[in-house]
């Protein structure tokens, strides 16, 4: 594989912040490689909402969940990121998702997430970044995806701009392959959190 072992290991970055009882929303999770690890961390009182646009990918992800854990995972096939009437989400996870979305779809995703989060929600983000010595590989990937899956982009998104515009502050970051892909932990910036007004009279 061109991307190697580090690519697969990167998907485990920051999963340790998931606590027993958490509700975790995985968006664009593909075949579910990280599902067993998330299940272990959120425990029997936790819940996973696993959203994927491809039915084929979703079926493969279901195969990674044992019978005794199936009640703890809700699988949703969706392209518009819409959730049913769930409670607040504790952890949002997007891994190698935003790079395949248009700017409009990215903003739609942030809008959907905003409706389901609280001040304590964490967002675990992982995606490719434009680095000089990997431009050929980025071009190859985007061109290949464009031909095979109608990839809408010609270049990688400005992820940092979107997180900043939607009031998410970066708390931690880990780079892989000299910055070719990065894992980041985000939380809502203080200005985005509605604080209660206390009147002292």
Language model features with spans:
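Class I SAM-dependent methyltransferase SAM/SAH-binding core
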Residues: 25-82
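Helix-to-beta-strand junctions that scaffold the AdoMet/dcAdoMet cofactor pocket
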Residues: 43, 101-102, 117-119
